[in-house]
Design a protein with these regions (language model features):
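Non-heme di-metal
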Residues: 1-141
Protein backbone atom coordinates (compact mmCIF):
# COMPACT_ATOMS: atom_id res chain seq x y z
CA UNK A 1 0.00 0.00 0.00
CA UNK A 2 1.38 3.46 -0.83
CA UNK A 3 2.45 5.90 1.86
CA UNK A 4 -0.04 8.68 2.52
CA UNK A 5 2.57 11.05 4.01
CA UNK A 6 3.83 13.54 1.43
CA UNK A 7 1.22 12.59 -1.16
CA UNK A 8 -1.20 14.83 -3.02
CA UNK A 9 -3.97 12.78 -1.39
CA UNK A 10 -2.65 13.76 2.04
CA UNK A 11 -2.80 17.43 1.07
CA UNK A 12 -6.31 16.92 -0.32
CA UNK A 13 -7.42 15.28 2.93
CA UNK A 14 -6.06 18.26 4.88
CA UNK A 15 -7.94 20.64 2.60
CA UNK A 16 -11.09 18.54 2.86
CA UNK A 17 -10.84 18.53 6.64
CA UNK A 18 -10.32 22.29 6.82
CA UNK A 19 -13.10 23.12 4.37
CA UNK A 20 -15.69 20.87 6.01
CA UNK A 21 -14.75 22.03 9.52
CA UNK A 22 -15.05 25.67 8.47
CA UNK A 23 -18.36 25.01 6.70
CA UNK A 24 -19.71 23.41 9.87
CA UNK A 25 -18.90 26.48 11.94
CA UNK A 26 -20.19 28.88 9.27
CA UNK A 27 -23.49 27.02 9.08
CA UNK A 28 -23.89 27.21 12.87
CA UNK A 29 -23.27 30.94 12.65
CA UNK A 30 -25.85 31.20 9.86
CA UNK A 31 -28.32 29.18 11.97
CA UNK A 32 -28.00 31.64 14.85
CA UNK A 33 -28.81 34.48 12.48
CA UNK A 34 -31.81 32.59 11.09
CA UNK A 35 -33.04 32.12 14.68
CA UNK A 36 -32.67 35.84 15.37
CA UNK A 37 -34.64 36.63 12.22
CA UNK A 38 -37.37 34.13 13.16
CA UNK A 39 -36.64 31.53 10.47
CA UNK A 40 -36.78 28.39 12.64
CA UNK A 41 -36.99 25.98 9.68
CA UNK A 42 -33.93 27.51 8.04
CA UNK A 43 -32.08 27.46 11.36
CA UNK A 44 -32.86 23.77 11.83
CA UNK A 45 -31.76 22.91 8.30
CA UNK A 46 -28.53 24.87 8.78
CA UNK A 47 -27.81 23.01 12.03
CA UNK A 48 -28.41 19.69 10.28
CA UNK A 49 -26.03 20.71 7.50
CA UNK A 50 -23.46 21.83 10.07
CA UNK A 51 -23.59 18.39 11.69
CA UNK A 52 -23.13 16.74 8.30
CA UNK A 53 -20.11 18.92 7.53
CA UNK A 54 -18.66 18.15 10.96
CA UNK A 55 -18.94 14.44 10.17
CA UNK A 56 -17.27 14.99 6.79
CA UNK A 57 -14.35 16.71 8.51
CA UNK A 58 -14.03 13.87 11.01
CA UNK A 59 -13.93 11.32 8.19
CA UNK A 60 -11.01 13.14 6.58
CA UNK A 61 -9.31 13.43 9.96
CA UNK A 62 -9.57 9.65 10.45
CA UNK A 63 -7.46 9.13 7.32
CA UNK A 64 -4.96 11.76 8.49
CA UNK A 65 -4.08 9.77 11.63
CA UNK A 66 -1.47 8.07 9.46
CA UNK A 67 0.12 11.45 8.61
CA UNK A 68 -0.28 13.52 11.78
CA UNK A 69 -2.44 16.32 13.09
CA UNK A 70 -3.07 18.76 10.23
CA UNK A 71 -2.50 21.68 12.61
CA UNK A 72 0.71 20.49 14.25
CA UNK A 73 2.03 17.58 12.23
CA UNK A 74 2.26 15.66 15.51
CA UNK A 75 0.90 12.13 15.98
CA UNK A 76 -2.71 11.99 17.11
CA UNK A 77 -5.43 9.47 17.72
CA UNK A 78 -4.84 8.33 21.29
CA UNK A 79 -5.86 10.66 24.12
CA UNK A 80 -2.32 11.36 25.32
CA UNK A 81 -1.23 12.27 21.77
CA UNK A 82 -4.38 14.32 21.23
CA UNK A 83 -3.86 16.36 24.39
CA UNK A 84 -0.22 17.05 23.49
CA UNK A 85 -1.09 18.07 19.94
CA UNK A 86 -3.92 20.30 21.17
CA UNK A 87 -1.60 21.86 23.77
CA UNK A 88 1.02 22.61 21.13
CA UNK A 89 -1.51 24.14 18.74
CA UNK A 90 -3.18 26.29 21.41
CA UNK A 91 0.25 27.40 22.68
CA UNK A 92 1.26 28.45 19.17
CA UNK A 93 -2.00 30.32 18.66
CA UNK A 94 -1.80 32.08 22.03
CA UNK A 95 1.89 32.91 22.09
CA UNK A 96 2.59 33.61 18.43
CA UNK A 97 -0.17 33.52 15.84
CA UNK A 98 -2.81 35.79 17.39
CA UNK A 99 -0.22 38.22 18.72
CA UNK A 100 1.22 38.56 15.21
CA UNK A 101 -2.29 38.99 13.83
CA UNK A 102 -2.89 41.72 16.42
CA UNK A 103 0.33 43.53 15.48
CA UNK A 104 -0.60 43.45 11.80
CA UNK A 105 -4.16 44.65 12.48
CA UNK A 106 -2.92 47.49 14.68
CA UNK A 107 -0.31 48.51 12.09
CA UNK A 108 -3.08 48.77 9.52
CA UNK A 109 -5.25 50.84 11.85
CA UNK A 110 -7.72 48.11 12.83
CA UNK A 111 -7.49 48.59 16.59
CA UNK A 112 -10.78 46.84 17.36
CA UNK A 113 -9.69 43.79 15.37
CA UNK A 114 -6.30 43.89 17.11
CA UNK A 115 -8.04 43.85 20.49
CA UNK A 116 -10.11 40.87 19.33
CA UNK A 117 -6.95 38.99 18.34
CA UNK A 118 -5.38 39.83 21.72
CA UNK A 119 -8.49 38.47 23.43
CA UNK A 120 -8.16 35.30 21.38
CA UNK A 121 -4.48 35.02 22.33
CA UNK A 122 -5.39 35.13 26.02
CA UNK A 123 -8.13 32.55 25.51
CA UNK A 124 -5.81 30.21 23.61
CA UNK A 125 -3.18 30.45 26.35
CA UNK A 126 -5.86 29.45 28.86
CA UNK A 127 -6.89 26.57 26.60
CA UNK A 128 -3.28 25.42 26.35
CA UNK A 129 -3.02 25.38 30.12
CA UNK A 130 -6.18 23.28 30.38
CA UNK A 131 -4.76 20.76 27.91
CA UNK A 132 -1.43 20.68 29.77
CA UNK A 133 -3.16 20.24 33.11
CA UNK A 134 -5.37 17.41 31.88
CA UNK A 135 -2.41 15.65 30.31
CA UNK A 136 -0.45 15.94 33.54
CA UNK A 137 -3.42 14.71 35.56
CA UNK A 138 -3.91 11.65 33.37
CA UNK A 139 -0.43 10.69 32.22
CA UNK A 140 2.24 11.98 34.61
CA UNK A 141 3.10 10.02 37.74
Amino acid sequence: MPKLAGSKTSENLKASFAEAAQASRRYLYFARQADIEGYADAAGMLRDMAEGEANHSLGSLDFLREVGDPATGKPFGMTQQNLLSAFQDESYQGNEMYLEFARAARAEGFDEVAEWFETLARAEKAHAERFRSMSAQLFED
